[in-house]
Regions:
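A short acidic-Thr-Gly-centered motif at the start of a beta-strand
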Residues: 1-3, 151-152
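N-terminal beta1-alpha1 ligand-phosphate binding loop
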Residues: 7-33
Length: 219
């Protein structure tokens, strides 16, 4: 693969979301260094890609995705991972479904002059998920959302996580193709037991990772 251009990076934030890609048909090629950490390069059906554990939080996601974008000149960012749902979401119905959000908001952005979720002088939201087939809004925060009071100003947001907004923003600012795949692990005010949440994260990661690998052949 010496002269092969790697154009895609698959990012996940929580270590519980990591999947053994070799069991899904991918082949480990080598490790690369990103911010003094080693991450694998895999090959799947003759397509090479980076598999990056960005770690939890908006800042980590932004740092790792920007570094990978600049260092390796990728053109595609795929982010898969767990998210929480509003209390109005039917958790049992949606638990095993993949979610493809349409808009991304920053839950930590609140000012007297802009609508909730908008950074000053930045777009109101990002709408660049090339997989978006559902009219869902996702909000990202450095806080885990577990109470309705935390998002009382965001009644228009359906799902919550701690990284997708950063991936959407970095993709937009670097003119990268962005693909976001989410799935439910919890719901505001319910099923907050850490063991149950982690179990849901691990279970959902399998189908999300399979989808991400299949996507490689189409982008």
């Amino acid at each position: 693969m010496k002269n092969i251009k790697i154009k895609t990076a698959i990012f996940y934030a929580d270590k519980q979301e990591q999947v053994n890609l070799e069991l899904l048909g991918a082949k480990f090629i080598k490790n690369v260094s990103v911010l003094d950490l080693n991450f694998p390069v895999y090959e799947y059906k003759n397509i090479y890609f980076f598999y990056i554990h960005s770690q939890i939080g908006l800042i980590n996601s932004a740092i790792f995705s920007q570094t990978v974008a600049v260092k390796f000149l990728i053109t595609n960012i795929i982010n898969y991972g767990a998210c929480g749902g509003r209390s109005s979401i039917d958790f049992s119905k949606m638990k095993n479904q993949l979610i493809f959000p349409k808009r991304f908001y920053l839950l930590d952005a609140k000012t007297p002059w802009y609508q909730p979720g908008q950074l000053p002088f930045e777009p109101k939201f990002y709408e660049n998920n090339l997989l978006a087939t559902q009219n869902f809004n996702l909000g990202s925060s450095n806080s885990f959302i577990f109470e309705e009071n935390q998002v009382k100003d965001f009644q228009f947001v359906d799902f919550f996580d701690m990284e997708a907004f950063s991936f959407a923003q970095i993709s937009a600012k670097n003119s990268l193709n962005f693909y976001c795949i989410k799935y439910l692990s919890d719901k505001i005010g319910q099923n907050l037991d850490i063991l149950e949440v982690n179990s849901n994260i691990k279970q959902g990661a399998q189908s999300a990772a399979k989808y991400a690998l299949a996507l490689l052949e189409k982008i």
